[in-house]
Amino acid sequence: VTEEQRFEQRIAQETAIEPLDWMPEAYRKTLIRQIGQHAHSEIVGMLPEGNWIARAPTLRRKAILLAKVQDEAGHGLYLYSAAETLGCAREDLYQKMLDGKMKYSSIFNYPTLSWADIGVIGWLVDGAAIVNQVALCRTSYGPYARAMVKICKEESFHQRQGFEACMALAQGSDAQRQMLQDAINRFWWPALMMFGPNDDNSPNSARSMAWKIKLHSNDELRQRFVDNTIPQVEILGMTVPDSDLRLDETTGHYRFGAIDWQEFNETIAGRGICNHERLAAKRKAWEEGAWVREAALAHAQKQQARDAA
């Protein structure tokens, strides 16, 4: 039995692939791309929310938002560690993102214009992320699957916090309800785009599904998200900006309108509303934080030398 046949056998049996196991080079590269982009999304995702920490309406909301952004930093570090088990360095992954050679989730290139946007990001954006990530808890690569289990627990808490913030606005004044509706109108379609292109236009899906890196297609996950979310929109007394949305009585699924893939393609090509601003902020943080990384490394080397002596 060749190494490749043994690998395929393990995938078929749903036995986790671990870092020291043999794996095809293309499998390793696919994982580095996916986990790296996932990590970048957590790190860049801190920016739109960080924008409101100093302007949160109450001390309680500020404490919640601080904790949430801190969680996202932790998720990013966790995922970079998972990627490093595949033999790449996080510095290289980060540099590729800064150079535009690796992507992050398109949703984070939209601005947060009001406090309602923060609630809607927690509810809709983290809600979409959870649909994606719960499926990844059974992905074929062990370190990635285990990272996802921890991250999903925290993300589901973020989503409940987001919905609670939206509920407070939905029960508030007319101006607050209008602010919430406006945020939903702006984030609904970008949230649906988070699942990636339609299955017939997704270049990496078939390979990823054959290797069980992905267990469900983009369109399946998008449908699941819509089915989960529309009843929540109704509880809030809000609507989504889709005149084609309707419940299909025979299937029990919601039918929704066509997504503007032109907007998605422009955003992932680096021409979205905030792409330039997001990368500039990350580049500045990377350069200004260099002394911290150098100091931590020097300290670790000193400790190591002391322990060796």
Predicted features by range, described:
Residues 1-18, 40, 92-102:
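Acidic, low-complexity proline/glycine-rich segments
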